[in-house]
Amino acid sequence: MIESILSGAVRFRWLVLFLTAVVGAIGAWQLNLLPIDVTPDITNKQVQINTVVPTLSPVEVEKRVTYPIETAIAGLNGVENMRSLSRNGFSQVTVIFKESSNLYFMRQQVTERLAQARPNLPAGVEPQMGPVSTGLGEVFHYSVEYEFPDGKGAKVKDGEPGWQSDGSFLTERGERLTDRVSKLAYLRTVQDWIIRPQLRTTAGVADVDSLGGYVKQFVVEPDAAKMAAYGISFEELAQALEDANLSVGANFIRRSGESYLVRADARIKSADEIARAVIAQRQGVPITVGQVANINVGGELRSGAASRNGYETVVGSALMLVGANSRTVAQAVGDKLEEIKKTLPPGVVIVPTLNRSQLVMATIKTVAKNLVEGAALVVVILFALLGNWRAAVIAALVIPLSLLISAIGMNGLNISGNLMSLGALDFGLIIDGAVIIVENSLRRLAERQHHEGRLLTLKERLEEVILSSREMVRPTVYGQLVIFMVFLPCLTFQGVEGKMFSPMVITLMLALASAFVLSLTFVPAMVAVLLRKKVSEKEVRVIAVTKERYRPLLERAVARPMPFLGAALVTLALAAMAFTFVGREFMPTLDEQNLNLSSVRIPSTSIDQSVAIDLPLERAVLSLPEVQTVYSKAGTASLAADPMPPNASDNYIILKPKSEWPEGITTKEQVIERIREKTAPMVSNNYDVTQPIQMRFNELIGGVRSDVAVKIYGENLDDLASTAQKIAAVLRKTPGATDTRVPLTGGFPTFDIVFDRAAIARYGLTVKEVADTVAAAMAGRPSGQIFDGDRRYDIVIRLPGQQRENLDVLGALPVMLPAVEGQPRASVPLRQLVQFRFTQGLNEVSRDNGKRRVYVEANVGGRDLGSFVDDAAKRIAAEVKLPPGMYIEWGGQFQNLQAATQRLAIIVPLCFILIAATLYMAIGSAALTATVLTAVPLALAGGVFALVLRDIPFSISASVGFIAVSGVAVLNGLVLISAIRKRLEDGAAPNEAVIEGAMERVRPVLMTALVASLGFVPMAIATGTGAEVQKPLATVVIGGLITATVLTLFVLPAVCGMVLRRQKKLEKPGGELLEA
């Protein structure tokens, strides 16, 4: 069939060229539509269930909220893993599903299970599912702030919206903001009611998160003494506000034939109307809210805050919808914000702080630069070695055509163009088959022309093109099949590594398949069309000189093979020794151009104290000339996609372009060291320096933010905490450990209110009545809402901040006694019903699949991940004794490296068995098949030496390089063996067949090796964004092809000569060879 395709391509060459042009045009159109991203979407399918319960401690949250939800979700079909977090007043359960699951269907299933769990949850508690986004869904951050944060430099016109001469800020609605809380609450109002609703309409945006400022509230601050004097309870105050804030419909009336809708709108519209609301009557005199309480426009008891460049702000985050493209969504968000800016009130601005599309474009710029430079080098080599510009053009045209055809397949398979899918394309590797066919056609046309002594006729030329293509189609087909097979292991990857590398392998296979089809159709047709004139019989000088120097060495290798075999064995032994010194890591870290400084303080740190620490930290880091801006997110945002306690902050450090860095500062490691020096004097901090995407990536795959984690499982939290501290001490002593820390599960100061049940009973009260009074006074009780157009603000009853923190005031808090007819209602001080005491409680409780766990996390610097874990595991086993029932697991990126390595250990040998079987089918001799396979070890040896010389750890990226170079080595060996077998079939002696066959294949072997290796040179030496991910793969291929080429030209002929001579000795009397 293939021969028919070749003949048809030559005979109908103009039709083939026309169809190729059409397909190329379709490919160009598809390439323009190809979605662009940084890396493949590696996120797992998960659903977050967030539950806010302000009045419960971490242990109570675990017992009464987290556990019932986990129990309800357990057993749901498709659940792969489940982890949870219980903190003060907050529960988050993360359910991870199998990749084959339909996320929207699973969310429906979770909704049904949550309905089953609700009867087991505390009254009023409502679990909420997180947005339909991913762990890497935050594609755009922006800051909502005053154009002049403190009013300095602003144009002041009293009476007009903006800053006033007295330091206050006048809103467009005439509200005068005089204090810090009201100013920040105004920024939050702008974010929640102007920016967020518009931004949520952007295509590809799942939701918009808000953090910082204060959610505006109308706060009713009761005076406990006045309430006691009037005999009014907290419950009566709350009920009075709800009763005074009503809107009811009364159907309609008819008058003069017309219908009038009856409205009875008694909604409260302002703080003054709250003050005039009647609570009760005493002796016929109405008691209003204003008589027993102060009414202020204030803010929530917040759990999160944000700041930028040393000033408090509000930070918004656009969350990308699952399956959307980060570049297009981030660009759409940026464009939408530009429109929204026109609708902002005077004096308020939006400042973009993190835009994922900028990283995408910087990464793709690096990939495109490497592809163009690699293609240019390949074309130069083709021109230099073929010595015929027409032939070089034919081979070079396969490069853009294969890329365009691949784009059609990528769109069809929903693969984005990114660092992995496009970054591994080596056009030299892809066009190897085309180069072999073009080179053979060029050689045969020259030989036929020399034989005829004239220019060939059209018929002769076409016949020769068909014969030359047919001659090389067998090694080309089997060689391409072998290259396909060597990449099969990568398609067996699962989890994160599968999502990361499968698109790369599929794209490479699409390009190889495209080039292969073009080699059978387009290339013969173009050869028949372009190579019409006289073909030079003389080889280019480079090839001629190479052959001249090569022949005597080749003859020596065939005649005396043992020294060459000995050198090969020594090389393999040295490579095996060198590999023991090569480090291991899951994959190289992408340089995101920005940094993230995670700060953790002692558990008792309040959100306001965290902000007070963040502000000077931002100013200190901002003083570095290479830093463009610094912004911080402390605590938990409204959607709780990334919940943090009040004592933790993420400080995002946005760097300037490297061209603007100070002289002498060239690497990010130097910048990190300078940041550490700046933050070292800061007290009450534990810093972890990483990158925004890297941090979320680590957290996504292992539930932690660092490179590696030791997860400790058990039941007793005290034992878990003490064991974690011991392991952390061991890790800190292990070379390479940086930013080692143990999340503090305990040490959270707790103010306990202990009920005296006997006293409560003596006064005729119930525990609930006392508890409701405490909760309303301390935590606050919502008592309706005020509507302002589309906006709505809660009315909340709670004690003033200073009174809430004063034990004497709390002790004197009146608890109203049951009413006695005919007597004024009496009260009893709270201190007579309860006791106050301070204790140490838990900060958080974490669980994996229903099992309590604590972890120790660390980043790794100065050494590879694999050797660090090996070293640390030995030290922990020797120095830390685990209590009964407790066990540890290693998590983080090492977990993925381990899983991928174990899978490769099984799949790679199976693939090599398949390759050997394929070669045997192509060659028909077990001995010669084994001879070709000897190319693989020396190719791998070159890759190992290259990694050692460049001090690059072994990673999954490097393993793909080893796989690629193995395929090229086998292809070259197959091309050489095919030439030797042809001469044997023509009757040549073994030594003559080996020498002449090798001499004939010098040029194609050198060309395939050079174009494949030089195509990777730009990737190996690149320094742009994303280059670090490509370097291991490119380095391995270049180093491997150097040794593989030496093997193909010297060791392979030497081994082949030995095998053929042995077969000659075993020849039967009838001339048939015995199988060796």
UniProtKB/Swiss-Prot annotation:
Q: Which InterPro entries match?
A: AcrB_DN_DC_subdom, Acrflvin-R, CusA-like
Q: Which Pfam families does the record associate with it? A: ACR_tran (PF00873)
> Which GO-annotated molecular functions does the record name?
monoatomic cation transmembrane transporter activity; xenobiotic transmembrane transporter activity
User: Its principal location?
Assistant: membrane
Q: Which GO terms describe its biological process?
A: response to cadmium ion
The answer to whether keyword Chaperone applies is no
Cellular compartments per GO CC: plasma membrane
UniProt entry keywords in alphabetical sequence: Cadmium, Cadmium resistance, Cell membrane, Cobalt, Membrane, Nickel, Plasmid, Transmembrane, Transmembrane helix, Transport
Ribonucleoprotein as UniProt keyword? no
Q: Which residues cross the membrane?
A: 14-34, 367-387, 391-411, 419-439, 476-496, 503-523, 562-582, 904-924, 929-949, 960-980, 1004-1024, 1036-1056
Q: How does it sit in the membrane?
A: Multi-pass membrane protein
Q: Which family does it belong to?
A: Belongs to the resistance-nodulation-cell division (RND) (TC 2.A.6) family.
What is the role of this chain?
A: Component of the NCC cation-efflux system that confers resistance to nickel, cobalt and cadmium. May form a membrane tunnel, which allows ion transport across the membrane.
Which protein is depicted?
Nickel-cobalt-cadmium resistance protein NccA
Organism whose genome encodes this protein: Alcaligenes xylosoxydans xylosoxydans (Achromobacter xylosoxidans)
Q: What is the lineage of its organism?
A: Bacteria, Pseudomonadati, Pseudomonadota, Betaproteobacteria, Burkholderiales
